Amino acid sequence: MKHFFLRVEHMTTLASMYFACAMLALAAALGLFQIITRFVLEEPAEWTEVMIRFSLIWMVFMGIPMAFRQGAMVSVDVLHRWAGPRMKRVLDTVVMIASLSLVAVIIIVGWDYSLRGKVQTIIGLEEYSMFWAYIAMPLGGLFSVLGIIGNFFDPVRMELETAL
């Protein structure tokens, strides 16, 4: 069961990371398009600014699961190095519970925002509702839950590699 969960978690986390990378590429392409239309053609495309903002929102919330999976979000590396094996597991459990609590708030509030955003339209793209921007929060949160639990079952200690 644990092996199956970790396999599913790996696939979903990888998919969310690929999606986050695609959103970053989209934001960069739209930014270039906006510069060309505004400064070269002198005909600004207002919708690009909104789409850049939304693609960056999606990039962040879909990239968070990988950060949780790599152990880079909530790190207690100093305590982890000083603690014995038993205390390390207690620390891992506390970090997991705290992370899941935070993500639960993001999921609940994000879902509420999404439902409220159904009646709002996106400025510059009036045919679309704000639901599509806000749904990134609960969706990224759900993927993050899998990453958090996956890191608990199969810890990855990359805090020193990801530190500046």
Model-flagged regions — what are they?
Residues 1-164:
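Alpha-helical transmembrane segments and membrane-interface helix-loop junctions
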